[in-house]
Amino acid sequence: MEPQLNQEVINTAAQHDGPIETDAVIVGAGPVGLFQVFELGLLEIKAHVIDSLAYPGGQCIELYPDKPIYDIPAVPMCTGKELTDSLLKQIEPFGATFHFGQEVSVVEKQEDGRFFVETSKGTKFLTKTIFIAAGVGAFQPKLLRVDGLDQFDNTQLFYRVKNPADFAGKNLVIVGGGDSALDWALNFVAEGPNKAESVILVHRRDGFKAAPASVAKMKELCDAYEMQFIVGQVTGYDEKNGKMTGAKVTGADGVTRVVPLDVLLVFFGLSPKLGPIAHWGLDIERKQLMVDTEKFSTNIPGIFAVGDINTYPGKKKLILSGFHECALAAFGAAPFIFPDKKIHLQYTTTSPKLHKVLGVESPVFD
């Protein structure tokens, strides 16, 4: 399900006796982090990209790889995976180096103005600039708190769906009232290769945060006896021979009923956590990094923040906004990397220099 990097892009880091010296380190390989590679590349700035996930795409891949996105300019509709794949193709010419499955644990300013960066896996860098594109930070699913339930993690209890085929033909109990819960309930009821044997949706109340159309469709399916909806909360489980056989659901009437199941899917949303970023000395407001809107610089010169991780007056958490921020951040970083060079704005439509950087032929006009 995860997007695949081409060999030219993956360029995994070779073994180094000392830190990897580079012009830019990007923290986060979501859509905004990937586009930051592009904007830096146009200025001939090469980057290393670090992400805690094992693959690129960030929230787009982790949360909604197959859900449609409608607000990317000139792309009427694409999925999170399609957007990620397109961005990976777009940044191929710039040969970014990716370091997956690791978090940045140390950031220290050096006497020469550079930053020493170390990851949780011990990868070390000396970089002139840092771009934080970490989305909402390290996001963790909100857990269903029932004593002993965690023993079934990733066998019968799941907080996300990586491969829908794994749940085909199963008796599913889905807990939650947001878009993810409703979307997956409808997905597993629908005819097709991933159709479940049965789907029961459990939510603590009759009101939902999900899209009204999804709620209406769910109720229509319940009326047709194709799925069930129960108002209540999961308060326990039945177990036999080390296997969960049912969820105990307590309704508003105080009565607890046992609902048979093969798999319990829980969608309570995500709890964003800044993680180590919170200890880097950056100005933070409500778990977001404060930036100026000229260069998207933080309070520490040389460290920039783009995408959902930042905040400023009028901030809108849109992928589109993040892309705009990447361009200004790249130009804002250029003086740290090329202090004696004046950077001119050039256009990819007409600049032979940019055509060379992109590896394309310059058009000849009559």
Swiss-Prot record:
- One function term, GO molecular function aspect: flavin adenine dinucleotide binding
- Reaction(s) the record says it catalyses: 2 reduced [2Fe-2S]-[ferredoxin] + NADP(+) + H(+) = 2 oxidized [2Fe-2S]-[ferredoxin] + NADPH
For the protein in the UniProt heading, the enzyme class is oxidoreductase
Q: Which Pfam families match?
A: Pyr_redox_2
- InterPro entries referenced in this protein's UniProt entry, alphabetically: FAD/NAD-bd_sf, FAD/NAD-binding_dom, Fd--NADP_Rdtase_type_2, Ferredoxin-NADP_redctase_2
Q: Which UniProt keywords apply?
A: FAD, Flavoprotein, NADP, Oxidoreductase
Provide the E.C. number(s) assigned to this enzyme.
1.18.1.2
Q: Which cofactor does it need?
A: FAD
Bound how, and how many: what does the cofactor note say? Binds 1 FAD per subunit.
Q: Which positions are annotated as binding FAD?
A: 51, 59, 64, 104, 139, 308, 349
What protein family is recorded?
Belongs to the ferredoxin--NADP reductase type 2 family.
Instruction: Give the quaternary structure.
Output: Homodimer.
State what protein this is by name. Answer: Ferredoxin--NADP reductase
